[in-house]
UniProtKB/Swiss-Prot annotation:
NAD(+) binds at residues 262-267. A motif (SIFI-degron) lies at residues 9-24. The keyword Cytoplasm does not apply. Keywords: Acetylation, Mitochondrion, NAD, Oxidoreductase, Transit peptide, Ubl conjugation. This is Aldehyde dehydrogenase, mitochondrial. The modification N6-acetyllysine is found at residues 52, 73, 78, 159, 368, 383, 426, 428, 451.
């Protein structure tokens, strides 16, 4: 995902991982020590109330890295109480200057940058993504996100309003309160930053549940939050499982807002829980089946490489992956041939190796699910052009896979696979492809490749998606909002828009003896 990766353009992958590109990347420790595996509440580390733990697994080997405290409802209750206490009127956090909140966020970014090599290695160990990507892409964007929101801390404010009569009226942007945040496993550090940045910049307090597959880096950042000087209770982090810890956050009567990134299926559950409890505010960044439209006048070399990047980046584990590649019929055969050749050349292997482009899938569940989709694609008549099998004798590695002759009604064209499986579909006209691209329950992202500005403008307006890229893919910046249409979610993250979900707007109107202009 992401701008830091996309700016390397066609050099991404093995060209990004060339000797010249990796000179600035420190050598990783392939067995980084785990320092934080408990529950973080009130700037202190705790075992779970139940004393239960769960294993976190290295997806490259299937071996257990360590045991992690398994948070449950009782632990969430403790975390919410700590957060609520930190949010009381007159508390150090509530009385803190907004500019000081910004300095704390900048300090946190500085500490993450100090420990960047360690965090990148730990992310690769726990998640499986290539270390070079962890270091150059994920950590780079974490730092930019936190520093961007640090700058907003004392600049997001209300305004005076000239209402009629002898009155003075103004608005205040006040923090929502206790914010439950549930982050996914595909970008653990980055999604943590996307959630923490706007919440803390606007003065909220946080109870965060980290994904059970990848808890280690987000927990280590908790240590840095304390070191940065955030008061106790402002950020609390609970590792655990969705049906227990996650559900406890979503249904908690003293949580004022919940932000979730993950599957549409779980997003539905969270929205129902929020509504049936205290009607807490909800923002959801959910699944996608994003159309990537290649017009016949597109730059072929660029379009092939970007379509490859759009699907295969992060082992295909991106909510906004370009997972429906629509190619105009007069260039279809050449595009397919080149895409297959590119997929066959993709380097799959040890994610700590600087030559590796693709590591393992995050866990056995995802591994089996993706292989199941590949089998379904073959059974339903899609043409398997390359890959389709297991890529290693241990770990959760899958061969880069390309299907051609994919039809809109096939399962692999409708459902989110979340793996290294490219589906290429043929179209004739621009009107046809708009209808087919929009014929989806999802609407997270889309892309268009063309040299014709009129076509680009028409398609970018016609496509039902929260983000449309033109002649590029996966270009992100902390300044630009991201979120979905339809069943891809509600609300926006990043940019100034990302602050709106974390504030209440209060109107204050004062009677004055006489109003003058």
């Amino acid at each position: 995902m992401l701008r830091a990766a996309a700016r390397f353009g066609p050099r991404l992958g093995r060209r990004l991982l060339s000797a010249a590109a990796t000179q600035a990347v420190p050598a990783p420790n392939q067995q980084p020590e785990v320092f934080c595996n408990q529950i973080f509440i009130n700037n202190e580390w705790h075992d779970a109330v139940s004393r239960k733990t769960f294993p976190t697994v290295n997806p490259s080997t299937g071996e257990v890295i360590c045991q992690v405290a398994e948070g449950d409802k009782e632990d969430v209750d403790k975390a919410v109480k700590a957060a609520r206490a930190a949010f009381q009127l007159g508390s150090p956090w509530r009385r803190m200057d907004a500019s000081h909140r910004g300095r704390l966020l900048n300090r946190l970014a500085d500490l993450i940058e100090r420990d960047r090599t360690y965090l990148a290695a730990l992310e690769t160990l726990d998640n499986g993504k290539p270390y070079v990507i962890s270091y150059l892409v994920d950590l780079d964007m974490v730092l930019k996100c936190l520093r961007y929101y640090a700058g907003w801390a004392d600049k997001y404010h209300g305004k005076t309003i000239p209402i009629d009569g002898d009155f003075f009226s103004y608005t205040r942007h006040e923090p929502v309160g206790v914010c439950g945040q549930i982050i996914p496993w595909n970008f653990p550090l980055l999604m943590q930053a996307w959630k923490l940045g706007p919440a803390l910049a606007t003065g909220n307090v946080v109870v965060m549940k980290v994904a059970e597959q990848t808890p280690l880096t987000a927990l280590y950042v908790a240590n840095l939050i304390k070191e940065a000087g955030f008061p106790p209770g402002v950020v609390n982090i609970v590792p655990g499982f969705g049906p227990t810890a996650g559900a406890a956050i979503a249904s908690h009567e003293d949580v004022d807002k919940v932000a979730f990134t993950g599957s549409t299926e779980i997003g539905r559950v969270i929205q129902v829980a929020a509504g049936s409890s205290n009607l807490k505010r909800v923002t959801l960044e959910l699944g996608g089946k994003s159309p990537n439209i290649i017009m016949s006048d597109a730059d072929m070399d660029w379009a092939v490489e970007q379509a490859h990047f759009a699907l295969f980046f992060n082992q295909g584990q991106c909510c906004c992956a370009g997972s429906r590649t629509f190619v105009q019929e007069d260039i279809y055969d050449e595009f397919v041939e080149r895409s297959v050749a590119r997929a066959k050349s993709r380097v799959v292997g040890n994610p700590f190796d600087s030559k590796t482009e693709q590591g393992p899938q995050v866990d056995e569940t995802q591994f089996k699910k993706i292989l199941g989709y590949i089998n379904t694609g073959k059974q339903e008549g899609a043409k398997l052009l390359c890959g389709g099998g297991i890529a290693a004798d241990r770990g959760y590695f899958i061969q880069p896979t390309v299907f051609g002759d994919v039809q809109d009604g096939m399962t692999i064209a409708k459902e989110e696979i979340f793996g290294p499986v490219m589906q290429i579909l043929k179209f004739k006209t621009i009107e046809e492809v708009v209808g087919r691209a929009n014929n989806s329950t999802y609407g997270l992202a889309a892309a268009v490749f063309t040299k014709d500005l009129d076509k680009a403008n028409y398609l970018s307006q016609a496509l039902q998606a929260g983000t449309v890229w033109v002649n590029c893919y996966n270009v992100f910046g902390a300044q630009s909002p991201f979120g979905g249409y339809k069943m891809s979610g509600s609300g926006r993250e990043l940019g100034e828009y990302g602050l709106q979900a974390y504030t209440e707007v209060k109107t204050v109107t004062v009677k004055v003896p006489q109003k003058n202009s």
